[in-house]
């Protein structure tokens, strides 16, 4: 489901940015839910998530964009940071994919807020596709013995 939402978001990003962003937001939430299936989150993950989320929200307040974009940025950051924080402790390939996905999202938001260059666009899309491939390969080809740590 999350990959389909990412695909839909990719397909319509130039036509309907808000709809595309909603697709990505829901995809991040679906990934987080899947990560909970593989490993119950630890208390420290919640603490780190809240701290990172708060720091990014503070930074968002200093960006010169409309209030609506700031609200959207906070909501999107909520899902992005959750995906990264709750990826710790699950198979490393998923964790690395989640971190790269986060970086690609930050680059995409930067490109959206400021004028994008060919280089920044290349790094944004390049890191996005690497992240999606890392996650997809691990999900589609199985987990072996790594699944469901309950510690």
What are these model-predicted stretches?
Residues 1-151:
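Polytopic alpha-helical membrane-helix bundles and their juxtamembrane interface segments
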